[in-house]
C-alpha cells in the first residue's frame, strides 16, 4: 500500500498501531490526522526535547514501536463536521487539510499526496512549518473542547459568555506559553483565534459530540498532553489543569454511566 491515512482519534491509536503491519510495505507512508499533540511530535525535534515520548499520547511507546518515524507525514485537518448517525457525517464548513514533513522539508511524497487530495476537491497546502500549525489548532482544541464538554455549549455560546470566554482566554495564554517554551511562536493572536471560533457559529466541538454520543473523549491528546508539557517546562498551567481535571472526572462518570446502562436490569 502506498499511503495509509490514520483517521481514528488519538486515544484509539495505541490499539490500532500494532495492527498496521500487514498493510505496510517497504515505502508505505502513514499520514496522521489526529487532533492535539501527535505521538511523533518530538521525533527529530532536536535539542533537549528530542525523542520525548508523552505517556498520555503513546502509552508504553506502543505507537512509536509500530510506526517508524520515516513513514510519517503530518497533517492538520480543518473541517467542521458533526456525526448524525453511524456512518453519516454532516459537513458544516471547511475543506482544507495541510500536509507537511515533520522535519520541515519539501518532499515528493507530500506533493503526490496533495495532488490526489486536490483532485478530489479538497484544498491541500503543503507547509514547512507543520509544528507551528499544530499549535495554532491546539490553541483552540485545548480550550474550547473541554469547556464545551463541561458547559454543553456551542462555540458561539462560549465566546459570547464573558465569564466562560475569560476561562478560555486564560487557557489559551497558558497554551501559548508552552508553545513559546518549545520555540513555536504562534502566527495568530488569541483574539484572532477566539474571533474565528465565533464565526463558525452554533457548532458543537468534537469533544461535546463524543460526550453526548457516549463515546470516549479525546482528552489526553488535546489537553492532558499540554498540561504534561507545561509541567515539564516549569509552567504553572493553573487554568488548564483545573479544566482538565474537571473534564477527566466528567469522562470517568460518563463512562461509568454508559457501562451501567449496558448492564442487564440496571
Give the ranges of each region predicted by the language model:
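NAD(P)-dependent Rossmann-like dehydrogenase/reductase catalytic/cofactor-binding core
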Residues: 157, 165-266
